[in-house]
């Protein structure tokens, strides 16, 4: 009878070693997977506008705290050092944006008030849907030292629109991004 137990023990020992090796392999795969940087949803895109001027932009759709979706387009026109703008677009018919209305931005104890430049853009100024607004992004980007989350507030339109750190990181890369 003892021989039967020894054979079972040997077989179980080999089975246990196989299971442990499998668990170790799964653990290593999991660690490698978690250690790799994830891809962000937003990306910098490069193209030329209708006048042939180089444009570098970050495009992201985000929801405010009332679950309304907004498209945020941060872009730079021309070579590095060119104008930096943030366009916020709502769905036509659902929202009407009055101009000029400053965009209020906060992060921790810091806050900014971005100037409304919508009426300076002939395309947006002539758009009867009034579903878009454009703001000067340069003062915000000049002050940001980290990729911290931001909270946007547009009085009379939305009370809070959270902007995640990966989007802030892309916005911060706009001033120096190659054409």
Tell what function each PLM region has.
Residues 12-35:
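Bacterial N-terminal signal peptides
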Residues 45-79:
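Low-complexity, acidic Ser/Thr/Pro/Gly-rich terminal tails and inter-domain linkers that flank the onset
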Residues 52-58, 97-101, 143-149:
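A short, compositionally biased
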Residues 109-158:
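Short, solvent-exposed, Trp/other aromatic-anchored flexible loops in extracytoplasmic proteins
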Residues 162-179:
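Short beta-strand elements
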